[in-house]
Amino acid sequence: MAGKLKLVAALGAIILMGGAIALADRQTAPEAATASAISGFSRDATADLQGYYIPLWNAETSVSAKYRAGNFVLNNLAISTKTELAAFEKSGASGIKNYAPVMLEFDDVTSPTGENELGQTYYETTERILPDAYAITADTLTFKGTGPTLGTVTFTGKADPKGIKAARNAPAHISKGAVLTGTLTVGDTVIENVELMWYGGE
C-alpha cells in the first residue's frame, strides 16, 4: 500500500465534488473524547482490517457521502498489512515520507483539479493525517493524528469483519454498504455517523 500515493476509486465519482455534506456536531461526542485520550500503538493480533475505507457511495444516484471540515473532505482511511503495522509499531515510523500503515487522507475541495490516466478527476491539494496513536481490535479502530493544516484529527469506529471479508472475496473488491462506522473529529468539528465502505484498491 506504500506505493499507492493517491487513491482514486474505480467507481467513477466516489470522491468528487457532488454529494451530501455531512452535518457537523460541534459538541464533543464520547467516542471523540476516547480517541483524543489514547497514546501509543496497540493492535489485537487477530485483527485484519487491511484495506481502504471510503465514504459510502450510492450506486443508484452515483453520489457519495461528504464528510467535510472547512475546505477539506475525507477521501479515505487506509489500513495496511499486519507486517507493515508490526514494523511501524516497533519504531513509530514507516521509513517512507508522508506515509504510515494507518492514515487518513483529505482533499482540499477549493484546490485545482486534475485528471488521471483513467479520466477520473482528483483534487491537486491533499493532506494526509499520520498517526500519533491508534488502537486496533478485530472490530474497532481508534485513531489520533495531526495534520499541518487540519490539526488534531481523531476517528473512533466500529468495523464489520464479516462484511469486510465478503468484500475481499467479491469480484469488484468493494463492500455493498458501510463496514466501518463511527465519529470523526477535525479540530473543533465533530462529525458523527460517518459511514465508510471497504475498497480493495487498484
What are these regions (language model features)?
Residues K6-V8, T28, A45, G70:
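Small/flexible residues
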Residues R26-S39:
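Short, low-complexity, disordered segments immediately C-terminal to signal peptides
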Residues R43-E202:
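Central antiparallel beta-sheet cores of small beta-barrel/beta-sandwich binding domains
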